[in-house]
From Swiss-Prot:
Transmembrane segment boundaries: 743-763, 767-787
InterPro entries: G_GB1_RHD3_dom, P-loop_NTPase, RHD3/Sey1, Sey1/RHD3-like_3HB
Gene Ontology cellular component terms for the protein in this record: endoplasmic reticulum; endoplasmic reticulum membrane
Name the UniProt record assigns to this protein: Protein SEY1
Membrane topology: Multi-pass membrane protein
UniProt-listed PROSITE patterns: G_GB1_RHD3 (PS51715)
Organism: Phaeosphaeria nodorum (strain SN15 / ATCC MYA-4574 / FGSC 10173) (Glume blotch fungus)
Amino acid sequence: MMMNSHFAGVGDNVDKEAYGHGIQVVDEDKVFNNNLSTYLNIEKVIPAGFNYHLISVFGSQSTGKSTLLNYLFGTQFGVMAEQERRQTTKGIWMSKNKRPEGGSAMAENILVMDVEGTDGRERGEDQDFERKSALFALATSEVLIVNIWEHQVGLYQGANMGLLKTVFEVNLQLFIKDSKTIPKSLLFFVIRDHLGTTPLKNLQNTLTQDLSKLWSTISKPKGLENSRIEEYFDFAFVALPHKILQPEKFEEAVTKLSLRFKEGYNDPKTSGLVDEAELPIFQPQYHRRIPADGFPAYAEGIWDQIVHNKDLDLPTQQELLAQFRCDEISREVLVLFDETIAPLEEKQAEDTRMGKPSVIAELGAAMNAARSTVFKDFETNASRYHKGVYKRKQAELEGKVDTRLKALSQKQLNAAHKSGVESFSDAVSAAVKAGQKKGASYDFAQIVDSEKKKAIAQFGEQAKSIVIEGASWSSFEHELKVYRKDLDDVSGRLRKDEMRRLATRIERWVRSRLDESVGLEFNKLGTGRGGSGAPEHGERPPSEKDLWDRVWAIFTETVSSAEKRFTDRAQSFDASPEEVDVGLWRLRRKSWGVLRAKIDEEVMEGNILLKLRENFEDKFRYDEQGVPRIWRPTDDIEGIYTKARESTITVIPLLARFKLSKTSAPPPLDAWIGDAPASVTPADEEDLTPIGGLDEEEGKSLEEEMTVLSDAKQADLLIRFKKTADGVYVEAKRSAIGGITQVPLYFYGLLVALGWNEIVAVLRNPVYFIFLILCAVGAYVTYTLNLWGPMIRMGNAASAQALEVGKERLREFLESSESGRQAMAMSGNQPRGESVRMNRLNGNGKKDEDAEVEDLDDI
C-alpha cells in the first residue's frame, strides 16, 4: 500500500515541501484543516479569482478511486497494493492537477478531492462519515466523479444509490432555499472494467432510470415538490477498459478522458450533433461562483453545517440486515445462474469476435431452467426478511437476470436473422446459376418466393424455441417483421443485381451491333464516286450527305430492339414498372455512350486521316469508270489534284457536327432519352456518363454534346490531310516525269565500245580474271550473309582510330621541338577567330558536326 507522503495532514506544523503532493482537507475524525488557504497560496490558486475548478471522486472503498485520479490528473494520492484489501484513503484529500502532458488542452487550476470510500470494513456499520463526506463533496464540487464497476450498475448499495438518496435529500434541505437559487452540478459516472458485453448506452439508461426513481422518492422542501433531478444535476457517462487485463487500452482511454477536463459551452443549437464523448466537462453553470481566496472559508462553513446536522441518520438496523442478506442471497443464486448462462454468453462472445455468430442449440431450454431456478431459490431464502427490501431486491435480481437473458435471446435472434438472410441469398443465387447453366429460361420471381417461405419458416422455429416463460419482454413479433423486411430488401437487391446483369448483357449486344453497323457506314465515305467526275459543288452522294441520318436510324432501331429484349426478360423477375422504367432509361443513356465512343473511335486522328486519304485517292487515282490512272506528262495532274483535294476537304465539316440532313439540326437526343424517372436513386446514376443537354449541372449543352470535331482539331486535321495529299500529288508527278528521264539505249553501246580494250585485257589475263571472279564471289557471299554493314563500320572505325593515332603522334612531335611549342602557344593565345582542333576535323578537313553540338552544349 502506498501512503500519502508529501501531503500536509490536519494539525501538522509543516513547511512548504510538505504540500508537494497536496493536503488533507478533513481527517478521519471529521476535523477540518485550517491550512487549506496556505496550500492554495502555494499552488498559486488564490490569485486566480473564478479561474479554478473543483472535482471530487465518490465511490465504494477499494474500487480504484485514487488510482483513477492519479492517472487522470497526475496526482500522488495513496493507492492500495495489489496483495492487500484494506482502506487507503482516510478522510478527504486535495491536490492540484499535476498532469504534465495535459498542457493547454486541460483547464487551468483544477483542484481534485479524493474522498474516503464508502462501504469500508474499517468503519463497518458506521456510515456517518461517508455520508457527510459525500454530501460535502456534492455541495462544493462542480463535478462529482462517481467511480463504480460495471457489475455494480443496477445495484442499490453497490452503486451507492442509498447514500445518494440521503445526500440528495439533505442537500435540498440545507442548501436550496427556493426554486430561484439552484446551483447545478455534474454527476460524472466512470464505469470501470467495462468489458463491452453490455453497451455503455444500456448502462447509462440503467443509471439514469435509477437516479430518476431515487429522486422521485426523496422528501423535498415546500415549493420544490414537483422538481426534477435534471434541474439540479447534469449527467455524463464514460466507460474505461479493465486496468489489469487491458492496461494499454486503459491508459489510452484515461489519457483521452483527461483531455475533456476543459472549459466549454453547451450550445443548444448543436445538441445531439456533437459526440458526447468529446464534450468539455467544465460548463459555466457548474461553477459555484466563489472566488478562490474565499473558498477555504466557504468550504469550512459547509463542513461545519454538515457535521452538526442531525438529518444524516443511518437507516434502521432491520433494513440494513435485509439489504445485507438479500444482497448475499442474490450473489449466491447468481453463482448457480452463472454456471449455466456464462458458458453460453462466452460462446456468443467468441462467435461475435470471430465474426461468425451461430445459433446455439437448446438455448431456450437452458435459459428457462436457469431463470426459474434462480427466482425460486431467492424467494425461498430471502422472503423472510423486510418485505419492502425483499421486493426491491427481487426486482433488482429480476432486472439483472432478465437483462442477461434478453441479451442472449437478442443475440440468438440476430444470429438466426443473419444466417437466415445469408442462406436465403445463397439459395437464390445458386438456383439462378443452375438455371443459367441449363441454358433454359428460369422464373426468378418463383425462385425468390419459394426460398423466402423456407427462410421465414426456419426463423419462426428458431425464435419460438427461445421464448422465456413469464417474461413480458420475450416476444419475437418485431424481430419477425424486421426479418421479413430484410428478406424483401435482399430480394430487391438480388433482383436489381439480376437486372443489372441483364442490362450488361444487352449493352454488350448493343455495342457489338453498333460497332459493326456504324463502322460500315463510316467505311462508305468516298466509295461509289468517280474521280474527276465527282461534283465539286451541288448534291453529295448518299454515302456522305446522309451519313448522320443513317447512323441515327441504325442507333434508334438497335436500341428499340434492345429495349424490347430488356422489357420481356424483366417481366420474369417480377420487376415493378418503376424498376423497368429505370432500367430502360439507363439502357438509353448507356447506349448513347456506346455510340459516342464508337464515333470518337472512327474519327480518331489515325482513322479519320486514313478515311480522308482513301476518299481523296478514290477521286485522284481513278477515272470516271473507276479505272486506275497511269499518269503521263500530258495529263492535267494539277487540276485533277485540286478538285479531288477540295472535294475531300468538304467532308471534314460534315463530320464535325452530328446533324441530320433533313433538319440541319442535332437529333432530339434529350427527348429520345427522356427525363429521369422519379424512382431513380443515386446508386443508379453513379456509373452513368454525363450527357450534354440532359445533365445541366455539368455545364454542357446539346450542341456541344453533338460536336464530334472541335475547330482546333478540324484545323489540325486539315493541315495533316493537305500534307498527305501533297505527298500523293508529288508521287504522281514523279511517276509522270520518270517515264521520260530514262537512260538512252545508245549510251550502253557507247560504253561497251569505249571500254572494249579493258574488258579484253581482263579476260585474257588469268590473274586479273581469277581476281575478278574471287572479288565477285566474295561480294556475293558478303551480300548473302548481310555483312556489308559490319564491314563498313569496321573500316570506318579503323580509319578513325588511325586518324587519332596520327594526330597524337603529330602532337608529340610538335611538343618535342622548340619551334613547335612556340607555334602551339601562339595558336592558343589568339584572341579572335574560331579555334579548330585537329581531332575535331572530319575526313574532308572540315569541323565535325558532333564537335559543333558539344560546343553549343558548353555554352
